Regions:
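Active-site hotspot residues in diverse enzymes, especially metal/ion-binding acidic/histidine motifs
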Residues: 1-144
Length: 144
């Protein structure tokens, strides 16, 4: 199953594409803490799973980071990985690319809407309100 299909099945299973709602349905605790340069991370232990978000993130940014961390929980349930922000957000590691692709496919599931409003990756980035690198990942599934 490819990442877009996995994101679509996740939306169908939970009846929403909101990562906060999905976390709630899964019993994943969401915490907001001051994290310095770190935007978020997820972890699991004997008490359950949690997504920790930087308390200073704007709402839209928090949704993207939450979707990213949810991707780690769903795609890589046995790993405790930390999502570190870098100035260019260039993630060449396979796991990070997978969860980034999952996040943008979850948050922006409608190919037709994106195609109607965007003809370039730059337009897609602006329309979705995400960094260019995330828009590039989403564009792979719609041919922009």
């Amino acid at each position: 199953m490819d990442i877009k299909e996995f994101a679509q099945k996740t939306i169908q299973r939970f009846g929403t594409h909101d990562p906060f709602d999905i976390c709630n349905q899964l019993g994943i605790v969401i915490l907001y803490l001051p994290l310095g340069r770190m935007r978020g991370y997820c972890y699991s232990n004997e008490n359950g799973k949690a997504v920790v978000l930087h308390g200073g993130l704007a709402e839209h940014e928090a949704r993207v980071v939450c979707a990213h961390e949810l991707g780690h929980v769903l795609l890589h349930p046995n790993l405790n990985r930390i999502y570190l922000d870098t100035s260019t957000f260039v993630c060449e590691r396979k796991l990070e690319n997978e969860v980034n692709a999952f996040a943008v496919c979850l948050l922006f599931p409608d190919d037709n809407e994106l195609l109607e409003n965007c003809s370039t990756i730059s337009e897609l980035s602006i329309y979705m309100g995400v960094r260019l690198e995330l828009a590039q990942l989403r564009s792979m599934y719609i041919g922009v």
